[in-house]
Amino acid sequence: MQIIFVSNYINHHQLPFCRAMLSQNDGEFIFIQMEPMEQERIEMGWGLDVKELPFVHCYNEEPEFCQNLIDQGEIVIYGGVEEESYITPRIEAGKLTFRYSERIYKEGQWKFVSPRGLKKKYHDHIRYRKKDVYLLCAGAYVASDFHLIHAYPDKMYAWGYFPEFREYRVDELMDFKDKEEKIEILWAGRMIDWKHPDDAIHAVADLLKRKNQVHLTMAGGGVMEAQLKQLTVELGIEKSVTFTGFLSPSEIRIKMLAADIFLFTSDYREGWGAVLNEAMNSGCAVIASSGIGAVPYLLQHGKNGMVYRNGNVKEMKEYVSQLAEDRNTCRRLGMNAYETIRTKWNADTAASNLLRVIRSIQTENPEAAPDGPASRAEIIAPGKGYAYTRK
């Protein structure tokens, strides 16, 4: 079959899924890049040379060719693009289409009552509820957002982002982490308010009052970086914290391999959070906020990670202290996290599951995957994600 994947731009989070589709699909697969990557993302090491990827076509270079593929392609996956006019003719014509989307109410579901917002949601989504269009939910709370506006009834599937899976022997993976006596804690991302990097620093400051053998690496940069460095000085922990600046994706993976604990402190504005996939793949014991879109899909509290209630820094600190004192639990959580990515939440599984779903829809017998990518998206309200990880 012919599959056209349309998104804002190709990056290292999309590339493994594209390669899996190229490998598994028995027909043509094309990725259409709709816009150049932002400079900030390029500086973060996200840039790829599209000229080295023959399946990628850039809309700004081949507009007529690309638009024809969007209009006439057998199956189109469309997401990450704000402008709706590119896809509207296709949906109105009743051609099989998959939208993929992060949350539409990241700032809070109370916003769905806005008349102006509802008008746009009707135009973009609700009016197509009976058309041949399905939703791939890139985050556990996406289905809840769209359920509020009665869009995509019984046509929503669990989805996400699928960074490169790297295979390791479990003993090899744990050996990386046993090279240092100190407990190594890693935080990685843009240093902006809704990612709450200061929570990681406060947690380690509390831990250092009781345990000397701890080190925190803050990987990334952003508007809060200077403020965070000053905070470590004020708390007297600057010798125990290293700021690396932005690192390439490969360099981040190296840091993850060495880390015992990965702290993921974002709130509900983190639509997915692909660093979670990467940290789990690297065998880290993850401590993550329940507000992060990927968390209810990927983590089971106490089995393959620790999940604290969004905004509850006290609970997060308790988990940091608990794991810092118990390396065996760190290793158990890390090994189970690795297995979650190896067996379920990876690009190959996502491609295989989605292709089966597409074929089932084409034969007018829609059937979701039993679990993981392309399974039925449960309606998980944002306030229920914490409990969901404890099922």
Model-derived regions, located:
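Nucleotide-activated donor-binding/catalytic signature segment of Leloir-type glycosyltransferases, i.e.
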Residues: 53, 229-247
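Conserved donor-binding/catalytic core segment of Leloir-type glycosyltransferases
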Residues: 176-195, 201-204, 217
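Short alpha-helical donor nucleotide-sugar binding micro-motif in glycosyltransferases
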Residues: 246-247, 254-259
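Short hydrophobic beta-strand element within catalytic cores of glycosyltransferases
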Residues: 285-289, 299
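Conserved acidic donor-binding segment of nucleotide-sugar-dependent glycosyltransferases
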Residues: 300-302, 306-313, 321-327
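A short, well-ordered alpha-helix in the C-terminal region of glycosyltransferases
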Residues: 315, 322, 329-343, 350, ...
